[in-house]
Amino acid sequence: FLWPYSGMMSGCVAMYQATGDKKYKKILEKRILPGLEQYWDGERLPACYQSYPAKYGQHGRYYDDNIWIALDYYRLTHKADYLKKAIALYEYIYSGWSDELGGGIFWCEQQKEAKHTCSNAPSTVLGVKLYRLTKDKKYLDKAKETYAWTRKNLCDPTDFLYWDNINLKGSVSKDKYAYNSGQMIQAGVLLYEETGDEQYLRDA
């Protein structure tokens, strides 16, 4: 499946950044990235990575899985091709945005039943990081909109932790996972750094 494979990619990227050891760069470029391309689905547009290798046919496409890969590509943007792929994944991710519930990104392209913090919080982070790299204000504007939607719809006002998702009927799944709140903390800090709006810092 794509999810554990992308975790291996994240780990290798982190090791390369932390140590500067070129063996990790070699592993990424010679093994991990070629393997990752086995998941690329260019038949359905916008193109993205699907959950299972494409040679086995079409499978589910998850917005959150593609966010993490796009973030890793962002961290590898010393090559133009990596930035190009990160932007392509960003475009796919935001194809999952809809006006239902006032906005927000769905979790799965084939199961548009609910909108999850795990699809929206890291999309905010990705948007700010792409803005920093490209200086294209559309990324910052969409990051601010995504952050505001997530905070309005999925933040528990009693403890400021984040619920898991809200379905299209307006019912909230109130499970709370550390990675959801953690991504919103990071998003708030990044937005504060780019806008100077102290409300983002207070939120974080």
Predicted features and spans:
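Glycan-recognition and catalytic cores of secretory/periplasmic carbohydrate-active enzymes
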Residues: 1-204
